[in-house]
Amino acid sequence: DRLRGTSKKGELTETIGFINGTSVTSTPTYNFLGAIQGRMPGLNIYRQGGDMPAAYGWKVRNSRTNLFLVDGIERDFYTMDPDQIESVQVLKDGLSTVMLGQRSAAGVINVITKKGNVGRPRFSFTAETGFEKALKLPDLLGAVDYITLVNEAYANDLREPGAYIEAYNPAIIEKYRNKENPYLYPDVDWYDELLNNTAPVHRYNFNVSGATNSFNYFVDLDWYRENGFFKTNDANSYNTNAQTNRFSVRSNLGVKVTSTTFMQINLAGRQERYNQPAAGTRSFYSNILTTRPNRYPVYNPDGSYGSYIDSKANQNLKGLLYDNGHQFKDSRHMSFDLTIKQKMDFLLDGLYLEATGSYYSATSYLTTRSKEFAAYLYKEDGSYQQVGEDKDQGNSGNKDQRYRITFLKGAVGYDHSFGKHKVAALFVADLNQIQDQNVQKGYLRNYTNYSGRMNYNYDDRYLAEAVYTRGGYNWLAPGNRWADYWGVGAAWNGHNESFVKELNIFSTLKPRISYAVTGQAICDYAEYKQSYGTSKVHLYGGPFDNKWTEENKTASRLNPEIAKKLNVGIDLGFLNDRLAFTFDYYQNRFSDVVATSEIKTAILGNVYPRSNCEKYSYTGTEMVLTWQDRIRNFNYFINGNLSFEQSKFEYSPQLPKAYPWMSRLGDPVGMTYGYVADGIFQSQEEIDAYDAFLPSAVKSTIMPGDIRYKDLNGDHIIDMHDQTNLGSKKAKGYYGISAGFNYRGFDFSVFAQGTLNRQVYLNGDFMDGSGKKGEGAITSYVLGRWTPDNHTNTHTRVWYGSNNNNRQTSSFWIYDADFFRLKNVEIGYTLPTLLTRKLGIPSVRIYAQGMNLLTVSEIFDVRKDIDPEIWGGSFPMTRTINFGISIKL
């Protein structure tokens, strides 16, 4: 292990969470993070928007940056095949990460890959097939309801009840209602037109492992295919669906070269093609929300694509899907790790040398083969007006990504016991060199560390550890590139004490404590240097012409951020560890946080450059409770984890605030700031009686059904002085619950996870009024809008044009969004060996898996058509059902 050498779990003083590899394979998703979401307290994994490959983000105890390691070496987590994983380590406290130097404050996940075990070769084959289904899609209104609301919004803006847009007069509405002519009066359900209800997924895996006295091996081959939800045109010679095809391979080989020399060679590769329509997957999900159902028909009577008169291009969504071409990104990832360990017992018992060299390369090439198509406006007289024109498919390509990591490490270690005393020492020098062609012109980033670690173990009872690192990063200014980080820890294996054994209560009793000073370098390349460029300026007495000007303000004093981390924990086991409990309390204090000050100066004429100007802290508790037992042939377990966290924004250079509620200091980190809503104006009399309004939304523009804001300072004006902390974007609590059993060949497992005290801000398309003058879709949620007959405080009125009052960031649009999600269920049956051995097969297991089967959330009380983790114009959260067979030889 790059960070520790080798240590048994019972000898650890750090706080490291472990997830077994079987927990990863039991979840039917190819995204590694999605498989471990909710399984570890302190590890927050959350769904992000975008296309399929960019689905998840993660933080460890709200880390500002993240680092993903495979066998202790930096990698891309998308390269992981679940069957390659032996275990997952989550490095939580500072003591476990100090040796990472200028990235030691990061949240760290370290995946340990499988190695061969002594014995004959073991072959394993797994085949899975299943399907995905979108959990939630916005419930969009049909044409009649849409037009009714648009007319109502139009009448509201005019303050003329019953007014309507001439194009949507009552006679026209009846034509829509009666579906008189779907070409002139279309009513299109774009989700139904573009998307299938389900999308198939397939996965096949083969691996072989084994070991002899001189070498061990593990070889894994994996193929995965995931289709998207888009409908396709069989007439096309190319695929326009959002589809992922991935092939990965790994070979881990350990060779005992001599009795004192061991060599580990790890090779891994992955090739993936992600195909999508030329317009991009995400654009369709977002464009559906901006296309009203009666904008144009999908097809005209003659079979051509429908369009509309003010269109300057062919924007027919079906045409964009079928006849706009496609694009695909080919990604290739390759890694090679070589480690040689040489025992030096002939010099000193327990002395060894270790050297590691590693190379990782990731490249991707984006090919776009787009074409254009003609669409037509169908007129009432039966004539057509062409929009756009047919053009042949083109072909363009470019390198989308080039990313390389070179890692070199040399280490001297010592591990020896003297009676009851065990001493271990590790001294490491390592270089991690990163080149990303997409970041800062591909300039090399060099992380250099010189580290030392000392461990002392007395009689497996008293454990102590100290670690020191001098870390450097070449993008900082020359005088600021190096920093010192250190940590200490201690633990007591109380269960090994004779007086504790006599109590016959604890099978494990291990309190532990650690404290570390860690850091992270956050800066751009040569941010400390002044750069210049040309721009047109007017000098006194001279012409308006190009001149050399300063491009940036230098950050010459930028230093690494500092994170001081304290962790106090205890591990308890009872009844021979059938009942186990772990508790941790942590306090992470971040100082010298890199940010841009809000203070501006007229003399400078610009904002200040980034500097180490902020401070904030996180404190939290984490708990894990497990019970596992066996009753004859019935084995079962239940596990629960729970974490709570509080944060505090402690310092930032701010302009003086007129009122205390305007300051961020003392607030939790990551808050939403805005106006405090005080209900809805229910009548004109309420508006007349109120005396505080926005300058951009004066009293005369306010109508019943608009939001009323609190005048916090009592100056009769709603402005910046009335903005305050509205709520947290981050959950304060996370939990996970798992249980399972196996009995006479049957096995079952279930896992659920959720959040506590979480809020979301629903604005934009989720507001009651379109504000787009009748363009864009409207959801069924808006049917509950405020009207003279529906005096609600949960919805505003609808509006047609702009609405400066209701569109302000305010507490009105913030909702509780805690959720409980049945994340994974798996049921399997292993055929009797008496049956399978007749076929020459030692083990055959058939199984079914389900992912995201049930979700319960407070947000459903507000909107039933959105998922609490992701919504709107992004690739939706999906439910997956898988069926599989596993054969072991």
For the regions a language model picked out, list residue spans one by one.
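Short, small/polar-rich motifs associated with maturation and membrane association
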Residues: 1-249, 263, 703, 713, ...
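Extracytoplasmic gating/loop element in the C-terminal half of outer-membrane beta-barrel translocons
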Residues: 297-304, 319, 755-845, 850
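Extracellular/periplasmic, surface-exposed regions of secreted and cell-surface proteins
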Residues: 252-260, 266-271, 286, 310-370, ...
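Glycine-rich, aromatic-lined ligand/substrate-binding cores of catalytic
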Residues: 728-761
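Conserved small-residue
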Residues: 124-181, 279-280, 527, 614, ...
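Flexible loop and strand-edge segments within Gram-negative outer membrane beta-barrel domains
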Residues: 134-136, 183-222, 226-230, 240-315, ...
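C-terminal extracellular loops and terminal segments
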Residues: 608-617, 656-672, 721, 725-740, ...
